């Protein structure tokens, strides 16, 4: 059983640094955005000590739904950079100190944040035009007086040689595109664009019954259909308090 901790937003970065250094939580397994309704918007972090396999689950939240902000942990775990961008994309939570607070999957002109419970789908009719490329990153910083400012930096300079790799390239399987800056055959910079075949499965599941969602989990990854369905079934069984047979438990441990 994982240890569970709730940390106030104002102490999050300090306490997460203690977990990383003091308890050797060197692996951020996942970082998930949450909408708890009246209790606020927040994030759940799953941390692991790769030596002992000890796990800690950390949660934090903000009650400010109009302008939700939380400290970034991307300077503690590098892998948090894309996870925090995903949370911003779907929940609108901005992470203070994150080096690149752009959307990750959705268009930059998307209105609203689709995984919020109060999201209005009518705000985004089907667009038949291409989105304009964004060549600047957004950095959010807290000043000494407590005020929050936004800084922008240019991704590529005017004299850089830029090429696209994907989404049609065989190596990217149609799911993402890279913009790369080249110096000869050396890649100097790489800008990742995801979400080309994103289908909003998580949002669709909110309005379906448990049995109806099983077919959708199979489609998340055509190379991992069984694992995704299996994980969802285990989650549903645990939430409902269902006791499965010994045979099923044995298969869970071997799959």
Language model feature labels by segment:
Residues 165-251, 255:
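Active-site- and interface-proximal helix/loop "cap" or "latch" segments in soluble metabolic
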Residues 1-186:
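Terminal low-complexity/charged segments
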